[in-house]
């Protein structure tokens, strides 16, 4: 028997079956960076319309975690897909480099500033530490396959950026949004500093819940409000609080104007309580007998006076909408120095903003004899005992509730009134303008809009000052006596900014005021405060995007971060941009959820369910991590586990195998010489290119809408179903056995070439390493990198008015599926081995029969059988099987007649008819020795 193997067009490619990504990807990265891939892309895209995704800076502290990977990969997918869509999309990664976490790390290394080291030495150490952290994180981000200007990232501690942050504040001051005031701010006694809202986390804490009597100063007047002339014993208004330590700062009792309050007689005294809460108060106080003497509204009690239980002064009853009936007594203890609601209502009534607590959380001297010097949380018990001694304590119990804590120390924080600098939400209409700007932004998902609107509508003024060492100085001078800003503040801040641009923030602390103030130096002092780090990152639309030439003066199109950034970076950026420029800093804001494990639990070292991106890349490769990110609906929680990553690896293999099949069968194909014109191609080949065209339209739309999981789904459907289970299956015979340079094979290769050109581009934003690898194995002249390309424009399909249009092939796929069911059963019954052992008869109703017959002798190639014929549905015998899906179709089969051709494996009756090729069928003889078979349809 002759060996005809060398007459076959067997698939051949240098593209390996196994990705071996963990090993190969680092070499690819090396090539990308040695050849300056990012620079090549920028040069190729120069002059195109821009799309700017502005990188929200991660904090320069610690290793990257899986959440960082999700964020950076999503950004990279968008930047690369925008490049494919014809945009110039520069990406400059950034880092947030100032602030408390770095200070704490450096304190552990060298001690606190002013103790073992000077403040200047401390700042130098902070800068060095942050730079080291940036380098560590940068390596990991690059390993993810994220392309960007990694050699020139932006750091908030770059001298120029520090200077531009000062300039941003200057513009906000110039626009009239800054004011100074003593306001209650989140205060961490461990940090010794105020905290931004985004630095506050909530944990369960057990507190003492107390009901306290405030005795009426004028019993008769109070009783009269309830329509009562005589009462038995004193009258007291009962307040409820879970922070006994704040009672020394009490300056009023808040009631709700609309609520009904009752005067309740209990043994020897009368209590004032909200009518709806009388029963619950009595129950917890253990009072079983009481009588309601009279009722009135909260507004009736406004400005009546009640005696503080131990401070020796009396306080007014005032009215506030923040008073609810959710818990307590309907009367709220009000300390303007210790709470934002209390502060706001206190401003309305002109109350003193008392702050008897120092930065360390201890009472100041002169507060109260038994409290002076005590730490506030230790003072709770002392205050409760004091109330008990004074006969003011109605009830005390333990309460587990959610309490604000420092994100860094995890310890409870307090509200504390301190002199601070604020960006006002209302004095120049910032709140109103911001709410208007939000409406002009596209929020993805759209619930983000309502979320940030609620936050902006309800947020207090933004306290931007911090009492820290490592941060951008506010660069302000205030009058020693009046504490007013210097009248030339804008000009002076520019002077400071110029120095900072040269020498960094240390220039401010080294500055002798006389150098820029001249004679005014005698009357003015430097403000020692630094800026909230959220001001640093929130001003990058100005300090970085406006300042760097790569962005060409364009403002950012998109911000993309985790959903916690509505109150973080999205908020601070919106406030600063609106205060500076009167408009939002972004056109689109996209948020993603947090990573959780396979069971939906938060990632936690204590549970042991964390997955390190470094481990995944070292084991499975960056493209698997990227495919996992793209496969997930990122708008909700993003689940990751070894099992989920394994599924991504399986999906990757299917896509890779499809790409390998395409490349292997393009062996010997030169697109410049061998392409077949569309009108001369075999119909099924045009259909396959048309399926790629349809897939590309959906994939482009999904990329445009940032629905990357839909990109992956469509890609998988195309590779596994349309190509893998049909087209790539049925073309093997033609591809391998047809004449090597004949039109039947070249038509097929033309289709495979167009499909591969499209597929590699669909993959590039997500599976970047593999796309680059495929690109380097594709035939024909091409640019060095797929990343400089645009979506493939060489696709075409079948016309709708052709008889063998997409509808025809969709029906044929169903028919083939029904035939396969019959043959599968026969195979499991051991009646046939492979499908080529079968000769199939399709009994079809006239219209279907006509469509099937239009394929002529090529129907068998679609069905992968040695023979196939069509007969009338009415002629079907009892042995014919009725199709489940197609009413007018029955199927039967017999063993194929004739002999098996050793070259094509088809059974035919013309094997051996040509003496020179005595073992071959007629078709193979034509392909080996003649002009090659002709195929029209399949």
UniProtKB/Swiss-Prot annotation:
Molecular function via GO: aminoacyl-tRNA deacylase activity; ATP binding; isoleucine-tRNA ligase activity; tRNA binding; zinc ion binding
Needed cofactors: Zn(2+)
Binding site for ATP: 605
Sites where the protein binds Zn(2+): 901, 904, 921, 924
Catalytic activity: tRNA(Ile) + L-isoleucine + ATP = L-isoleucyl-tRNA(Ile) + AMP + diphosphate
The record's note on its domains: IleRS has two distinct active sites: one for aminoacylation and one for editing. The misactivated valine is translocated from the active site to the editing site, which sterically excludes the correctly activated isoleucine. The single editing site contains two valyl binding pockets, one specific for each substrate (Val-AMP or Val-tRNA(Ile)).
Subunit field text: Monomer.
HAMAP family: Ile_tRNA_synth_type1
Protein name per the record: Isoleucine--tRNA ligase
